[in-house]
Amino acid sequence: MDCISIDELHHRIKRLRPDDLILDVRTLEEFLAGHIHGAQNTPHEEVVSIADTLRRYETVYVHCKMGGRAKMAAQELEGTGLSNVVCVGDGGIERWIEMGWVLKK
């Protein structure tokens, strides 16, 4: 599984293509409080149920609050046979907020 930092995701944001997806695996309440623009929310406990729909994306960037849930979700998705998953760790949305980067509410 490929892993990148949230800083690297921030760097890549401007180059994301329509066939890339940012998957926020926090709870709906956390997501609604603030999320990365364009991100889709599916709580980490439910990601396996959307695995088939994720196959159409070139890259699926999985992130959460700090990185723990993202790692679990990415591993579960890889267990379904997906090879397009990138785990985003090293701070997650907490680091995003700390850096003052824009969130959508």
Feature names for model-found ranges:
Residues 1-21, 27-59, 68-105:
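Rhodanese-like catalytic fold shared by cysteine-dependent sulfurtransferases
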